[in-house]
Protein backbone atom coordinates (compact mmCIF):
# COMPACT_ATOMS: atom_id res chain seq x y z
CA UNK A 1 0.00 0.00 0.00
CA UNK A 2 2.86 2.34 0.88
CA UNK A 3 4.45 1.62 -2.52
CA UNK A 4 1.17 2.45 -4.26
CA UNK A 5 0.94 5.76 -2.39
CA UNK A 6 4.51 6.64 -3.32
CA UNK A 7 3.77 5.71 -6.93
CA UNK A 8 0.71 7.95 -6.90
CA UNK A 9 2.73 10.86 -5.52
CA UNK A 10 5.39 10.31 -8.19
CA UNK A 11 2.85 10.21 -11.01
CA UNK A 12 1.12 13.35 -9.75
CA UNK A 13 4.42 15.19 -9.56
CA UNK A 14 5.37 13.92 -13.01
CA UNK A 15 2.09 15.14 -14.49
CA UNK A 16 2.41 18.53 -12.81
CA UNK A 17 5.90 18.91 -14.25
CA UNK A 18 4.68 18.18 -17.75
CA UNK A 19 1.72 20.57 -17.38
CA UNK A 20 4.11 23.29 -16.27
CA UNK A 21 6.13 22.88 -19.44
CA UNK A 22 9.13 21.70 -17.47
CA UNK A 23 11.59 18.83 -17.83
CA UNK A 24 10.69 15.20 -18.17
CA UNK A 25 12.68 12.43 -16.56
CA UNK A 26 16.17 12.25 -17.99
CA UNK A 27 16.28 15.97 -18.75
CA UNK A 28 14.17 15.85 -21.92
CA UNK A 29 12.45 19.17 -22.57
CA UNK A 30 8.65 18.99 -22.81
CA UNK A 31 6.50 21.80 -24.20
CA UNK A 32 2.76 22.38 -24.29
CA UNK A 33 1.22 23.81 -27.45
CA UNK A 34 -2.29 25.26 -27.45
CA UNK A 35 -4.43 25.58 -30.60
CA UNK A 36 -7.41 27.96 -30.39
CA UNK A 37 -8.95 26.89 -33.70
CA UNK A 38 -8.77 23.10 -33.85
CA UNK A 39 -9.84 21.00 -36.80
CA UNK A 40 -8.92 17.47 -37.87
CA UNK A 41 -6.63 18.92 -40.55
CA UNK A 42 -4.86 21.29 -38.18
CA UNK A 43 -4.40 18.65 -35.49
CA UNK A 44 -3.00 16.19 -38.05
CA UNK A 45 -0.54 18.82 -39.29
CA UNK A 46 0.63 19.77 -35.82
CA UNK A 47 0.90 16.17 -34.63
CA UNK A 48 3.05 15.20 -37.60
CA UNK A 49 5.17 18.35 -37.35
CA UNK A 50 5.74 17.89 -33.62
CA UNK A 51 6.89 14.32 -34.27
CA UNK A 52 9.39 15.64 -36.81
CA UNK A 53 10.47 18.34 -34.34
CA UNK A 54 11.09 15.71 -31.68
CA UNK A 55 13.17 13.63 -34.11
CA UNK A 56 15.34 16.63 -34.97
CA UNK A 57 15.63 18.24 -31.52
CA UNK A 58 14.60 15.70 -28.90
CA UNK A 59 12.01 18.15 -27.58
CA UNK A 60 8.57 16.69 -26.84
CA UNK A 61 5.51 18.79 -27.67
CA UNK A 62 2.03 18.03 -26.36
CA UNK A 63 -0.88 19.27 -28.47
CA UNK A 64 -3.82 20.85 -26.61
CA UNK A 65 -6.84 22.67 -28.02
CA UNK A 66 -10.24 24.13 -27.33
CA UNK A 67 -12.98 25.26 -29.75
CA UNK A 68 -12.67 28.85 -30.97
CA UNK A 69 -15.84 30.03 -29.23
CA UNK A 70 -14.41 28.96 -25.87
CA UNK A 71 -10.77 29.88 -26.51
CA UNK A 72 -10.68 33.37 -24.98
CA UNK A 73 -12.30 32.20 -21.75
CA UNK A 74 -10.14 29.08 -21.59
CA UNK A 75 -6.86 30.96 -22.03
CA UNK A 76 -7.95 33.59 -19.52
CA UNK A 77 -8.67 30.87 -16.95
CA UNK A 78 -5.25 29.32 -17.61
CA UNK A 79 -3.65 32.74 -17.25
CA UNK A 80 -5.33 33.42 -13.92
CA UNK A 81 -4.17 30.02 -12.63
CA UNK A 82 -0.58 30.60 -13.86
CA UNK A 83 -0.77 27.53 -16.10
CA UNK A 84 -0.69 28.89 -19.64
CA UNK A 85 0.99 26.57 -22.17
CA UNK A 86 4.44 27.35 -23.53
CA UNK A 87 3.34 28.23 -27.07
CA UNK A 88 -0.12 29.44 -28.03
CA UNK A 89 -1.85 30.16 -31.29
CA UNK A 90 -3.23 33.56 -30.55
CA UNK A 91 -5.74 36.06 -31.91
CA UNK A 92 -4.16 39.50 -31.68
CA UNK A 93 -7.39 41.07 -30.47
CA UNK A 94 -6.60 39.50 -27.10
CA UNK A 95 -3.17 41.12 -26.79
CA UNK A 96 -4.29 44.13 -24.77
CA UNK A 97 -5.73 41.90 -22.05
CA UNK A 98 -2.83 39.45 -21.99
CA UNK A 99 -0.10 42.12 -22.05
CA UNK A 100 -1.75 44.04 -19.22
CA UNK A 101 -1.86 40.80 -17.22
CA UNK A 102 1.79 40.04 -17.98
CA UNK A 103 0.99 36.70 -19.62
CA UNK A 104 2.81 36.98 -22.97
CA UNK A 105 6.52 37.36 -23.63
CA UNK A 106 8.12 40.13 -25.76
CA UNK A 107 9.99 38.47 -28.63
CA UNK A 108 12.50 41.07 -29.87
CA UNK A 109 15.52 39.24 -28.50
CA UNK A 110 14.57 36.18 -30.52
CA UNK A 111 13.56 38.01 -33.69
CA UNK A 112 16.64 40.25 -33.74
CA UNK A 113 18.93 39.43 -36.66
CA UNK A 114 16.30 37.42 -38.55
CA UNK A 115 14.09 40.29 -39.73
CA UNK A 116 15.26 40.05 -43.34
CA UNK A 117 13.82 36.53 -43.64
CA UNK A 118 10.28 37.90 -43.19
CA UNK A 119 8.20 39.57 -45.90
CA UNK A 120 7.80 43.33 -46.22
CA UNK A 121 4.26 43.17 -44.83
CA UNK A 122 5.55 41.63 -41.59
CA UNK A 123 8.64 43.83 -41.23
CA UNK A 124 7.18 47.16 -42.24
CA UNK A 125 3.50 46.91 -41.35
CA UNK A 126 2.41 44.31 -38.82
CA UNK A 127 5.33 44.43 -36.41
CA UNK A 128 5.66 48.25 -36.41
CA UNK A 129 1.90 48.45 -35.81
CA UNK A 130 2.20 46.07 -32.85
CA UNK A 131 5.11 48.05 -31.42
CA UNK A 132 3.15 51.27 -31.80
CA UNK A 133 0.20 49.79 -29.95
CA UNK A 134 1.94 47.79 -27.25
CA UNK A 135 5.57 48.92 -27.14
CA UNK A 136 7.02 45.57 -28.21
CA UNK A 137 6.56 42.60 -30.55
CA UNK A 138 4.65 39.80 -28.87
CA UNK A 139 3.64 37.50 -31.73
CA UNK A 140 4.96 35.89 -34.90
CA UNK A 141 2.32 35.31 -37.59
CA UNK A 142 1.58 31.77 -38.70
CA UNK A 143 0.66 33.18 -42.11
CA UNK A 144 -1.05 36.23 -43.55
CA UNK A 145 -4.74 36.76 -44.15
CA UNK A 146 -6.25 39.46 -46.32
CA UNK A 147 -9.98 39.86 -46.71
CA UNK A 148 -11.83 39.55 -49.99
CA UNK A 149 -15.36 38.93 -51.26
CA UNK A 150 -16.07 35.34 -52.29
CA UNK A 151 -18.71 35.25 -55.03
CA UNK A 152 -20.78 32.46 -56.54
CA UNK A 153 -19.36 32.78 -60.04
CA UNK A 154 -22.09 30.65 -61.57
CA UNK A 155 -24.86 32.75 -60.02
CA UNK A 156 -23.20 35.98 -61.14
CA UNK A 157 -22.98 34.74 -64.73
CA UNK A 158 -26.64 33.71 -64.69
CA UNK A 159 -27.60 37.21 -63.54
CA UNK A 160 -25.36 38.95 -66.07
CA UNK A 161 -23.01 40.47 -63.50
CA UNK A 162 -19.65 41.42 -65.00
CA UNK A 163 -17.21 41.04 -62.11
CA UNK A 164 -13.53 41.70 -62.80
CA UNK A 165 -11.01 41.29 -59.94
CA UNK A 166 -8.51 43.51 -61.78
CA UNK A 167 -11.01 46.37 -62.11
CA UNK A 168 -12.37 45.89 -58.61
CA UNK A 169 -15.57 47.52 -57.40
CA UNK A 170 -17.06 50.05 -55.03
CA UNK A 171 -19.20 49.34 -51.97
CA UNK A 172 -22.28 50.49 -53.86
CA UNK A 173 -21.50 47.99 -56.63
CA UNK A 174 -20.96 45.28 -54.02
CA UNK A 175 -24.29 46.03 -52.32
CA UNK A 176 -26.02 46.08 -55.69
CA UNK A 177 -24.54 42.67 -56.57
CA UNK A 178 -25.95 41.28 -53.32
CA UNK A 179 -29.39 42.56 -54.29
CA UNK A 180 -29.15 41.08 -57.80
CA UNK A 181 -27.97 37.68 -56.54
CA UNK A 182 -30.92 37.37 -54.16
CA UNK A 183 -33.62 35.24 -55.78
CA UNK A 184 -36.41 34.00 -53.53
CA UNK A 185 -37.73 31.62 -56.18
CA UNK A 186 -34.43 29.72 -56.20
CA UNK A 187 -33.86 30.18 -52.45
CA UNK A 188 -30.75 32.16 -53.24
CA UNK A 189 -29.66 34.86 -50.80
CA UNK A 190 -27.13 37.48 -51.85
CA UNK A 191 -24.92 37.53 -48.77
CA UNK A 192 -23.70 35.50 -45.82
CA UNK A 193 -24.46 38.08 -43.12
CA UNK A 194 -22.46 37.74 -39.92
CA UNK A 195 -24.81 38.60 -37.10
CA UNK A 196 -23.00 36.86 -34.23
CA UNK A 197 -19.56 37.34 -32.68
CA UNK A 198 -17.10 38.99 -35.04
CA UNK A 199 -19.80 40.70 -37.08
CA UNK A 200 -18.69 44.20 -36.10
CA UNK A 201 -15.15 43.65 -37.40
CA UNK A 202 -15.79 43.92 -41.18
CA UNK A 203 -18.50 46.52 -40.55
CA UNK A 204 -16.04 48.70 -38.62
CA UNK A 205 -13.55 48.54 -41.50
CA UNK A 206 -16.29 49.81 -43.82
CA UNK A 207 -17.19 52.60 -41.39
CA UNK A 208 -13.62 53.77 -40.77
CA UNK A 209 -13.29 54.24 -44.52
CA UNK A 210 -15.38 57.39 -44.00
CA UNK A 211 -12.72 58.69 -41.60
CA UNK A 212 -9.58 57.85 -43.56
CA UNK A 213 -9.17 54.50 -41.82
CA UNK A 214 -9.12 55.97 -38.30
CA UNK A 215 -11.24 55.39 -35.22
CA UNK A 216 -9.93 58.29 -33.10
CA UNK A 217 -8.49 61.77 -33.38
CA UNK A 218 -5.27 62.64 -31.54
CA UNK A 219 -7.19 63.25 -28.30
CA UNK A 220 -8.98 59.93 -28.35
CA UNK A 221 -12.32 61.24 -29.59
CA UNK A 222 -14.19 58.78 -31.79
CA UNK A 223 -14.43 59.94 -35.41
CA UNK A 224 -17.39 57.85 -36.51
CA UNK A 225 -20.32 59.86 -35.12
CA UNK A 226 -21.21 61.56 -38.37
CA UNK A 227 -24.37 61.51 -40.50
CA UNK A 228 -22.42 59.78 -43.26
CA UNK A 229 -21.33 56.95 -40.95
CA UNK A 230 -24.80 56.48 -39.47
CA UNK A 231 -26.18 56.22 -43.00
CA UNK A 232 -23.48 53.70 -43.93
CA UNK A 233 -24.28 51.66 -40.81
CA UNK A 234 -27.91 51.40 -41.90
CA UNK A 235 -26.94 50.54 -45.46
CA UNK A 236 -24.83 47.63 -44.15
CA UNK A 237 -27.42 46.32 -41.70
CA UNK A 238 -30.13 46.64 -44.36
CA UNK A 239 -28.48 43.68 -46.08
CA UNK A 240 -30.09 41.67 -43.31
CA UNK A 241 -33.25 43.70 -42.77
CA UNK A 242 -34.12 43.73 -46.49
CA UNK A 243 -34.00 39.95 -46.71
CA UNK A 244 -30.77 39.54 -48.66
CA UNK A 245 -29.60 37.02 -46.05
CA UNK A 246 -31.56 34.28 -44.23
CA UNK A 247 -33.35 35.39 -41.06
CA UNK A 248 -31.32 33.04 -38.88
CA UNK A 249 -28.08 34.69 -40.05
CA UNK A 250 -28.54 37.08 -37.14
CA UNK A 251 -26.86 34.28 -35.19
CA UNK A 252 -24.31 33.22 -37.80
CA UNK A 253 -20.62 32.99 -37.00
CA UNK A 254 -17.69 31.86 -39.13
CA UNK A 255 -18.81 28.25 -39.64
CA UNK A 256 -22.34 29.15 -40.74
CA UNK A 257 -21.06 31.87 -43.08
CA UNK A 258 -18.76 29.49 -44.92
CA UNK A 259 -21.04 26.45 -44.91
CA UNK A 260 -23.96 28.37 -46.38
CA UNK A 261 -21.81 29.90 -49.10
CA UNK A 262 -20.17 26.64 -50.16
CA UNK A 263 -23.50 24.82 -49.71
CA UNK A 264 -25.33 27.02 -52.20
CA UNK A 265 -27.56 29.15 -49.98
CA UNK A 266 -25.71 32.48 -50.20
CA UNK A 267 -24.05 34.22 -53.13
CA UNK A 268 -21.31 36.31 -51.48
CA UNK A 269 -19.10 35.90 -48.45
CA UNK A 270 -16.79 38.53 -46.97
CA UNK A 271 -13.94 36.70 -45.33
CA UNK A 272 -10.23 36.01 -45.17
CA UNK A 273 -8.04 34.15 -47.61
CA UNK A 274 -8.19 31.05 -45.40
CA UNK A 275 -11.64 30.24 -46.82
CA UNK A 276 -10.10 29.65 -50.26
CA UNK A 277 -8.86 26.24 -49.14
CA UNK A 278 -12.40 25.22 -48.15
CA UNK A 279 -13.81 26.45 -51.46
CA UNK A 280 -11.18 24.49 -53.37
CA UNK A 281 -12.07 21.34 -51.45
CA UNK A 282 -15.86 21.61 -51.70
CA UNK A 283 -16.68 23.56 -54.88
CA UNK A 284 -15.90 23.40 -58.59
CA UNK A 285 -13.69 26.09 -60.08
CA UNK A 286 -16.57 27.41 -62.17
CA UNK A 287 -18.71 27.93 -59.06
CA UNK A 288 -16.65 30.50 -57.18
CA UNK A 289 -14.29 33.44 -57.53
CA UNK A 290 -12.77 36.10 -55.29
CA UNK A 291 -13.16 39.85 -55.69
CA UNK A 292 -10.99 42.33 -53.79
CA UNK A 293 -12.53 44.32 -50.97
CA UNK A 294 -14.63 47.20 -52.33
CA UNK A 295 -13.17 50.69 -52.67
CA UNK A 296 -14.38 53.35 -50.27
CA UNK A 297 -15.62 56.79 -51.32
CA UNK A 298 -12.04 58.14 -51.46
CA UNK A 299 -10.93 55.40 -53.87
CA UNK A 300 -8.94 53.54 -51.21
CA UNK A 301 -9.32 49.87 -50.33
CA UNK A 302 -9.50 49.65 -46.53
CA UNK A 303 -8.60 46.12 -45.56
CA UNK A 304 -7.16 44.32 -42.57
CA UNK A 305 -3.94 42.37 -42.94
CA UNK A 306 -3.24 40.04 -40.09
CA UNK A 307 -2.35 36.58 -38.98
CA UNK A 308 -5.22 34.23 -38.24
CA UNK A 309 -3.60 32.79 -35.15
CA UNK A 310 -0.14 34.19 -34.41
CA UNK A 311 2.33 32.23 -32.34
CA UNK A 312 3.13 33.60 -28.89
CA UNK A 313 5.11 32.43 -25.87
CA UNK A 314 3.60 32.63 -22.41
CA UNK A 315 5.53 34.09 -19.51
CA UNK A 316 4.56 30.95 -17.58
CA UNK A 317 6.83 28.85 -19.80
CA UNK A 318 9.90 27.44 -18.08
CA UNK A 319 11.49 26.66 -21.43
CA UNK A 320 11.16 29.89 -23.37
CA UNK A 321 14.20 29.27 -25.59
CA UNK A 322 12.81 25.88 -26.59
CA UNK A 323 9.41 27.49 -27.17
CA UNK A 324 11.03 29.92 -29.61
CA UNK A 325 12.83 27.02 -31.27
CA UNK A 326 9.41 25.44 -31.88
CA UNK A 327 8.01 28.64 -33.42
CA UNK A 328 11.01 28.87 -35.74
CA UNK A 329 10.51 25.24 -36.73
CA UNK A 330 6.82 25.77 -37.49
CA UNK A 331 7.73 28.70 -39.75
CA UNK A 332 10.58 26.88 -41.46
CA UNK A 333 9.99 26.79 -45.22
CA UNK A 334 9.06 23.12 -45.57
CA UNK A 335 6.59 23.27 -42.68
CA UNK A 336 5.22 26.74 -43.40
CA UNK A 337 4.35 26.08 -47.05
CA UNK A 338 2.43 22.94 -46.07
CA UNK A 339 0.59 24.84 -43.35
CA UNK A 340 -0.24 27.83 -45.56
CA UNK A 341 -1.62 25.69 -48.37
CA UNK A 342 -3.68 23.69 -45.88
CA UNK A 343 -5.09 26.80 -44.22
CA UNK A 344 -5.37 29.19 -47.16
CA UNK A 345 -2.75 31.60 -45.85
CA UNK A 346 -0.12 33.74 -47.54
CA UNK A 347 3.44 32.83 -46.41
CA UNK A 348 5.36 35.19 -44.14
CA UNK A 349 8.89 34.19 -45.20
CA UNK A 350 10.62 35.72 -48.23
CA UNK A 351 11.90 32.37 -49.51
CA UNK A 352 8.32 31.20 -50.13
CA UNK A 353 6.99 34.19 -52.06
CA UNK A 354 7.93 32.62 -55.40
CA UNK A 355 5.55 29.68 -55.01
CA UNK A 356 3.06 29.86 -57.94
CA UNK A 357 0.12 29.19 -55.61
CA UNK A 358 0.60 32.67 -54.21
CA UNK A 359 1.44 34.41 -57.49
CA UNK A 360 -0.63 36.93 -59.42
CA UNK A 361 -2.29 34.19 -61.46
CA UNK A 362 -2.81 31.66 -58.67
CA UNK A 363 -5.71 30.92 -56.37
CA UNK A 364 -4.79 33.81 -54.09
CA UNK A 365 -4.57 36.36 -56.88
CA UNK A 366 -7.12 38.83 -55.47
CA UNK A 367 -5.51 38.74 -52.03
CA UNK A 368 -1.92 39.16 -53.26
CA UNK A 369 -2.99 41.99 -55.58
CA UNK A 370 -4.40 43.91 -52.62
CA UNK A 371 -1.18 43.51 -50.65
CA UNK A 372 0.64 45.16 -53.56
CA UNK A 373 -2.02 47.77 -54.37
CA UNK A 374 -0.80 51.34 -53.65
CA UNK A 375 -4.40 52.28 -52.83
CA UNK A 376 -4.79 49.72 -50.05
CA UNK A 377 -4.80 51.06 -46.49
CA UNK A 378 -4.74 49.07 -43.25
CA UNK A 379 -7.15 50.86 -40.89
CA UNK A 380 -6.48 51.35 -37.22
CA UNK A 381 -7.55 48.84 -34.60
CA UNK A 382 -10.06 49.36 -31.80
CA UNK A 383 -7.16 50.39 -29.58
CA UNK A 384 -4.36 49.11 -27.32
CA UNK A 385 -6.69 48.55 -24.37
CA UNK A 386 -8.47 45.33 -23.41
CA UNK A 387 -11.66 44.96 -25.48
CA UNK A 388 -12.05 41.18 -25.32
CA UNK A 389 -15.29 41.49 -23.35
CA UNK A 390 -16.73 43.88 -25.95
CA UNK A 391 -15.80 41.55 -28.78
CA UNK A 392 -17.35 38.62 -26.94
CA UNK A 393 -20.60 40.50 -26.32
CA UNK A 394 -21.50 44.14 -26.85
CA UNK A 395 -20.15 44.58 -30.38
CA UNK A 396 -22.62 42.17 -31.90
CA UNK A 397 -25.31 42.09 -29.22
CA UNK A 398 -26.18 45.79 -29.56
CA UNK A 399 -26.53 45.41 -33.32
CA UNK A 400 -28.68 42.31 -32.85
CA UNK A 401 -31.00 44.39 -30.65
CA UNK A 402 -31.40 46.86 -33.49
CA UNK A 403 -32.04 44.10 -36.04
CA UNK A 404 -34.72 42.68 -33.74
CA UNK A 405 -36.43 46.08 -33.39
CA UNK A 406 -35.46 46.58 -29.75
CA UNK A 407 -33.59 49.86 -30.34
CA UNK A 408 -32.83 52.19 -33.24
CA UNK A 409 -29.74 52.10 -35.43
CA UNK A 410 -28.06 55.18 -33.99
CA UNK A 411 -28.48 53.96 -30.42
CA UNK A 412 -26.93 50.60 -31.27
CA UNK A 413 -23.87 52.13 -32.91
CA UNK A 414 -23.47 54.87 -30.30
CA UNK A 415 -23.38 52.38 -27.42
CA UNK A 416 -20.42 50.62 -29.06
CA UNK A 417 -18.63 53.81 -30.10
CA UNK A 418 -19.10 55.49 -26.71
CA UNK A 419 -17.59 52.52 -24.92
CA UNK A 420 -14.60 52.44 -27.27
CA UNK A 421 -14.04 56.17 -26.78
CA UNK A 422 -14.32 55.85 -23.00
CA UNK A 423 -11.74 53.08 -22.89
CA UNK A 424 -9.36 54.91 -25.22
CA UNK A 425 -9.48 58.09 -23.14
CA UNK A 426 -8.89 56.18 -19.93
CA UNK A 427 -5.96 54.39 -21.56
CA UNK A 428 -4.48 57.72 -22.63
CA UNK A 429 -4.77 59.09 -19.09
CA UNK A 430 -3.07 55.99 -17.70
CA UNK A 431 -0.43 56.03 -20.48
CA UNK A 432 0.31 59.73 -21.18
CA UNK A 433 3.13 58.96 -23.63
CA UNK A 434 0.85 56.94 -25.90
CA UNK A 435 0.37 58.31 -29.40
CA UNK A 436 -2.79 57.51 -31.34
CA UNK A 437 -2.34 54.74 -33.88
CA UNK A 438 -2.35 55.78 -37.54
CA UNK A 439 -3.52 53.85 -40.63
CA UNK A 440 -0.82 52.12 -42.68
CA UNK A 441 -0.74 52.70 -46.43
CA UNK A 442 1.12 50.78 -49.13
CA UNK A 443 2.52 53.93 -50.73
Which functions belong to the PLM regions below?
Residues 92-148, 202, 208, 289-291, ...:
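Hinge/lid segment of periplasmic solute-binding proteins
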Residues 77-78, 83-86, 115-155, 299-304, ...:
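A structural signal for short loop-to-beta-strand junctions that line the ligand-binding cleft
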Residues 48-122, 154-160, 259-260, 267-268, ...:
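Extracytoplasmic "Venus flytrap"/periplasmic binding protein-like
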Residues 51, 56, 60, 81, ...:
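Extracytoplasmic/periplasmic substrate-recognition and gating elements
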Residues 30, 121-124, 291-292, 341-401, ...:
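Long, aromatic- and glycine/proline-rich binding clefts that accommodate carbohydrate-like moieties
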Residues 175-181, 219-250, 293:
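Glycine-centered hinge/linker elements that transmit conformational signals in sensory
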Residues 132-142, 147, 157, 172-222, ...:
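Extracytoplasmic/periplasmic solute-binding protein
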Residues 108-123, 166-167, 190-193, 212-231, ...:
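Short, solvent-exposed loop/beta-turn-alpha elements that line the ligand-binding surface or hinge
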Amino acid sequence: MKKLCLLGIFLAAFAALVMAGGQRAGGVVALRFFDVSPSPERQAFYTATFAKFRTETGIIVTYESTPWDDAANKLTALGVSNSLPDVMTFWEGWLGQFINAGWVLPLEKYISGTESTYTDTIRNKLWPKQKQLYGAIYTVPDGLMVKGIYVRKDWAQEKGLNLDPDRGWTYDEYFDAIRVLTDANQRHYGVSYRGARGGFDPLSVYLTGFAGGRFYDDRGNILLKTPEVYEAFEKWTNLYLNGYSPRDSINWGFVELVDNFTGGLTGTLLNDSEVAATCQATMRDDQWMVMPMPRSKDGKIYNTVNAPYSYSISTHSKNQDAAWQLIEFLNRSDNSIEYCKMGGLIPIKTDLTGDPTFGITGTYRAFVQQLNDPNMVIPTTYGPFNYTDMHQGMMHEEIQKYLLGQQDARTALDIILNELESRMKKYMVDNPSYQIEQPLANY
